[in-house]
A protein has these predicted regions:
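Extracytoplasmic "Venus flytrap"/periplasmic binding protein-like
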Residues: 81-144, 160-161, 269-270, 280, ...
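Conserved N-terminal structural module of periplasmic/extracytoplasmic solute-binding proteins
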Residues: 5-8, 21-120
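Hinge/lid segment of periplasmic solute-binding proteins
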Residues: 36-44, 116-170, 181, 290-294, ...
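Periplasmic solute-binding protein
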Residues: 119, 124-129, 146-183, 198-223, ...
Length: 408
């Protein structure tokens, strides 16, 4: 199949546009008494008494004993802080990446407070499953995050979540195989060792196309009418590169944990992932583990920068909850500076709080450096317009067709 035709078929599959839904804004004026939102001392004993059961959803790792039961401990600390509130917490498991799909199916039956990846935001808004925040909560968010992070949880000037980390992927590599100059070029790395990349994962494959000037919903990722532009000569050239990449004896498609297991046993020398794999890799590789922003790749003699999708993970509030003042305060508490510090200590979740990022210990962390350099230098803000939902499956299937040798 011709590469231009193949790229056009992928584009056609991703171009069905969906419509914007209405946003829930019932908490736009909701004030919160969380200590993180106010610089002055708060008298929690002045709060009206509340007895309530609050449902909180988050990833399994944040509730696991091996990671210190971060979520439970932070909720218990919140309960102790609010002396007039008698709160019982019920926990459920839902990863940030699954929040949109899961919660939008039954908003009224879902958690009061939950964690979500910002690419899920428009889905949650369309389903009436996430509340617009306001008041001192938004003041705190804007005072403690970069503009890019704030933008990642903002739609039509409305803020919908309390960010707690940047969300992107970068490169892990074996320092015993690659030097600092080697890791600048993907093609150089392929000459010297085995490289694993999740080409059948739609969150990753776009990095090559964006690197060659292809766009998703315009330059800012917000123009639905512009659609996805992966067709034409630019898209065809990238597709040809990827077909050749799959044919390289040193390339391994990363699926079902192949990259992590290979890095740990030494059969793979570089992979692309995020902070969620850091602990396992660090324990297995020790000082040989290197972390870096994305490399370039050579397309027809030109070095092009790979660019990942980037965004944030945040704490959201369900507008259907019975006790919005509790839910908003808890969301802010789970995303405040102290909670981000404990998250970092427990699971190496890189903070986005600007005060924490200024601390010397965190600034020296190789993981933090790589994640922030990738976010700032080798990524684009992942579009979260409704039509982006039509990208994921066609992109995944297109990657599979390349890996399976259906394009040649």
């Amino acid at each position: 199949m011709k590469f231009r035709k193949a790229s056009s078929l992928f584009l056609a599959g991703a171009m069905c546009l969906s419509t914007f839904g209405g946003a829930m804004s019932v908490f736009a004026d909701e004030e919160t008494s969380s200590e993180a939102a106010e610089e002055e001392t708060v008298d929690y004993s002045a709060e009206d008494p509340i007895t309530a059961t609050i449902t909180v959803w988050g990833p399994a790792e944040d509730q696991a004993e091996e990671y210190g039961e971060w979520l439970q401990k932070r909720c218990e600390a919140f309960n102790e802080l609010h002396v007039n509130w008698d709160l019982t917490f019920e926990y459920g498991t839902c990863s940030e990446g699954d929040a949109g799909k899961t919660i939008s199916q039954d908003p009224s039956g879902s958690a009061d407070v939950y964690m979500f990846a910002n690419d899920q935001l428009q889905t949650l808004i369309d389903a009436g499953a996430i509340a617009e925040l306001g008041g001192k909560t938004v003041d705190y968010i804007k005072n403690t995050n970069s503009e890019a992070i704030i933008d990642s949880v903002t739609v039509n000037d409305c803020v919908y979540g309390v960010p707690f980390t940047t969300n992107t992927w970068y490169m892990f590599y074996d320092k015993s195989v690659y030097g600092e100059d080697d890791i600048k070029s993907l093609d150089t790395m392929l000459e010297k060792g085995k490289v694993s990349f999740p080409l059948t994962n739609s969150w990753y494959i776009g990095a090559f196309y964006v690197g060659n000037g292809c766009t998703l919903f315009g330059e800012d990722g917000k123009d639905e009418e512009a659609g996805i532009d992966f067709a034409g000569e630019k898209g065809a050239a990238v597709t040809k590169y990827l077909v050749n990449l799959v044919g390289n004896k040193n390339f391994v498609n990363d699926e079902s944990g192949v990259g992590v297991s290979g890095m740990c046993d030494g059969s793979i020398n570089a992979m692309f992932s995020g902070s969620w794999d850091y602990t396992k890799l660090s324990e297995a590789m020790g000082d040989n583990l290197g972390i870096a922003k994305l490399p370039t790749y050579n397309l027809d003699g030109e070095e092009l920068q790979m660019e990942s999708f980037a965004g944030s993970k945040a704490i959201g509030v369900n507008p259907n909850c019975e006790y919005p003042q509790v839910a908003v305060a808890l969301a802010l508490f789970l995303g405040n500076e102290e909670s981000q510090q404990m998250h970092y200590d427990a699971r190496s979740i890189v903070p986005c709080n600007t005060d924490l990022l200024a601390e010397e210990e965190i600034q020296k962390d190789e993981l933090v450096i790589a994640q922030n350099e990738t976010f700032d230098e080798t990524s684009i803000l992942q579009p979260f317009v409704s039509a982006m939902n039509n990208y994921w499956t066609p992109a995944e299937n297109f990657g599979k067709s390349i890996v399976n040798g259906e394009l040649h």
